[in-house]
């Protein structure tokens, strides 16, 4: 199995009579982070298919995904939970409304993974590294 980078594009996975569109966009962030993502381009040709969007910055969900698309699941990261979480509190919540875990709105969902690494400071306090396994099941 090889890797396929999805820069503002998608690939469709077929299994039996079912299909899932894996959609990937380049970074789509709030300033000072760049916005190179082109969601309409990436979604073109996915009508009527269950969509999983890979978008690095979770702010993309409220800014464009919820109001302008029918993406059912967005997978994101970026926040690292600010590498700090004590008893469920992280300062990340002041910058990112969705900063860790699963969020739902209507028939759309966002999962934010806090990642494995760190930014600037080589440590984590309470915001332990994670690898997430998501199992999609037919309704």
Predicted region positions:
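Soluble catalytic domains of enzymes that build or remodel membrane lipids, polysaccharides, and related
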Residues: 1-139
């Amino acid at each position: 199995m090889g890797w396929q980078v999805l820069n503002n594009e998608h690939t469709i996975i077929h299994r039996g009579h079912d299909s899932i569109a894996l959609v990937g966009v380049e970074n789509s962030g709030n300033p000072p982070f760049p916005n190179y993502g082109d969601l309409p381009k990436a979604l073109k040709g996915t009508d009527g298919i269950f969509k999983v969007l890979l978008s690095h910055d979770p702010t993309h969900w409220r800014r464009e995904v919820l109001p302008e698309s029918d993406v059912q699941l967005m997978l994101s990261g970026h926040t690292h939970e600010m590498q700090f979480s004590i008893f469920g509190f992280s300062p990340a919540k002041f910058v990112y409304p969705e900063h860790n875990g699963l969020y739902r709105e209507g028939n759309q969902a966002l999962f934010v993974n806090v990642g494995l690494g760190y930014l600037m400071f080589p440590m984590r306090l309470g915001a332990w590294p994670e690898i997430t396994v998501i199992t999609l099941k037919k309704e």
